[in-house]
Amino acid sequence: MVKIRLKRAGRKKMPVYQIVVADSRSPRDGKFLEVVGHYQPTLKPHSITLKKDRVEYWMHCGAQPTATVNSLIRATGLLYELRMKKLGRSEADIATEMEKWEAAQMARREKRVTLKARRRRAKKEAEAASASSAEG
């Protein structure tokens, strides 16, 4: 069986992964058929690059993505796009839907960042209040 999976590269404690198409019997960092992308988890935000046409080709040929790679493909919106193609939508419809999807993803990311900043601010205020009450 052919799998789309991660191949580790990079140095110690600084991983960089190649997204490769490989036979499921080959070892993690062993022989592979093709490199279809890269994933850098240490960057903020994470960097995911895919050759969308090649991923689509291999999935059409029957390659199964692993759970981690499936979530990375979903994060780029490729699975949503492939689903719409499978349903027979026109290219224009797919393009407008993908623009809406990207806008929703950006809004979700911004909301997450603002919530994180608000929590951090509240934590600092609570620490400052407890420190001032401990002094007095």
Curated annotation (Swiss-Prot):
Residue spans of biased composition, Basic residues class: 114-123
SUPFAM superfamilies: Ribosomal protein S16
Similarity remark: Belongs to the bacterial ribosomal protein bS16 family.
Gene3D superfamilies: 3.30.1320.10
PANTHER family xrefs: 30S RIBOSOMAL PROTEIN S16, SMALL RIBOSOMAL SUBUNIT PROTEIN BS16M
GO molecular function: structural constituent of ribosome
Segments of this protein annotated with the region Disordered: 114-136
A Pfam short name: Ribosomal_S16
Protein name in UniProt: Small ribosomal subunit protein bS16
UniProt KW keywords: Ribonucleoprotein, Ribosomal protein
Entry GO CC: cytoplasm; small ribosomal subunit
Any single GO BP term: translation
NCBIfam families documented for this protein: S16
